[in-house]
Amino acid sequence: MTMPCSFKEHGCTETIPFTEKLAHEESCLHAPCHCPIAGSRPYRGRSLRDHINMEHATIQYTRVTASSLSPLSMRNDEPARLVSLGSRAVFLLVVDRSIPSGRALSVIHLVSDPIEKEDFKYKIEVHTRIGILSVSGSKTPSVGRLTTTYQAGASLLVSDIVWSPQDSPVYLELK
């Protein structure tokens, strides 16, 4: 038994065996993809990394050194920051402002190819008016394309009461 891809209305012309439908749709280039940057609309085709480079050209890049807590000097209205770990890897620090009276910071490893997947440890640190807030993880999620809305596995919540762009520098460590 065969059936058309669920993304036929987005341009996919494949007719696939029922038993292969899920596998096909997970990798279908016509599937709508989601971007974790606030205000983004679904897109199709490209990897998240390519999408960000083409559609979010104003997102700033910061180069960091492995195993070093690096300042990012983020503006108050900055929705994200691209971070490169030398020539090894590119990460996206996501700033989610949908949190009432605050923001949530999380990090993802952007990959163009599943072969690029590598485990990176991370630490996000924010110096606030009341002290230092931090979150760390032993595995940074690797993302090629997001076929569902982005949900951070772990994030650092910072209240607007303690956040000030001048007084609350954001630091990131990757290793």
Predicted regions and their residues:
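Signature of small Cys/His-rich zinc-finger-like modules used by ubiquitin/SUMO E3 ligases
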Residues: M1-K175
